[in-house]
């Protein structure tokens, strides 16, 4: 990522998800990927503990940027237009028993980002609503087990949960968001997290309508 990781403001990153949505409730993919880049900077600022997520996210963002700059870029302006295009042209692999024909489809790629966004949303919400003496590692593990864990092998799940024990105390973690005191960070999360939640909910509904939530 360009520039030092500490030179970002998490509130700006979270509120940037507001730009993802049009008045019609469409999710604009350029803003979606830009917002995710900001989240990657946040994850990287916390050290190697989240590298297993941030590295995967970066690879998915590269796929989406390739699709946005490719010959069919007009179909990848919004999440809705992408889903309509790939589903109607059978560019989505639905059967896990068959050899993948479209491993880098936009639908599959965004689904991975969508799942990771849910984990981060739940984790940050847990930080916001928890008591001062809450263990960051426990909050992170609970969010992970409720979201991404279902898609990882047993070995990966064990390694991830061990890594979470290296997370700093809640107060230190909140102050790492560059929003002043931990109290100010909590207030900021209350203002900014609804934007992520709205993007997540719209994406979840769209994928459910097209039976895309369990793509292999």
From Swiss-Prot:
What sections of the protein cross the membrane?
Answer: none
The Gene Ontology biological process annotation of the record reads: ceramide 1-phosphate transport; ceramide transport; intermembrane lipid transfer; negative regulation of autophagy; negative regulation of interleukin-1 beta production; negative regulation of NLRP3 inflammasome complex assembly
Q: How does it sit in the membrane?
A: Peripheral membrane protein
Which Pfam families does the protein's record reference? GLTP (PF08718)
Q: Which GO terms describe its molecular function?
A: ceramide 1-phosphate binding; ceramide 1-phosphate transfer activity; phospholipid binding
Compartment(s) of residence: Cytoplasm, Cytosol; Golgi apparatus, trans-Golgi network membrane; Cell membrane; Endosome membrane
Per the annotation, which location comes first and is thus the protein's main one? cytoplasm
InterPro entries under this entry? GLTP_sf (IPR036497), Glycolipid_transfer_prot_dom (IPR014830)
- Name the UniProt key words of this record, in alphabetical order: Cell membrane, Cytoplasm, Endosome, Golgi apparatus, Lipid transport, Lipid-binding, Membrane, Nucleus, Transport
Recorded catalytic reaction(s): these are: N-(hexadecanoyl)-sphing-4-enine-1-phosphate(in) = N-(hexadecanoyl)-sphing-4-enine-1-phosphate(out); N-(9Z-octadecenoyl)-sphing-4-enine-1-phosphate(in) = N-(9Z-octadecenoyl)-sphing-4-enine-1-phosphate(out)
Its annotated function is as follows: Mediates the intracellular transfer of ceramide-1-phosphate (C1P) between organelle membranes and the cell membrane. Required for normal structure of the Golgi stacks. Can bind phosphoceramides with a variety of aliphatic chains, but has a preference for lipids with saturated C16:0 or monounsaturated C18:1 aliphatic chains, and is inefficient with phosphoceramides containing lignoceryl (C24:0). Plays a role in the regulation of the cellular levels of ceramide-1-phosphate, and thereby contributes to the regulation of phospholipase PLA2G4A activity and the release of arachidonic acid.
The UniProt entry's sequence similarity note says: Belongs to the GLTP family.
The protein in question is named Ceramide-1-phosphate transfer protein
Tell me which species this is from.
Rattus norvegicus
Species lineage = Eukaryota, Metazoa, Chordata, Craniata, Vertebrata
State the encoding gene.
Cptp
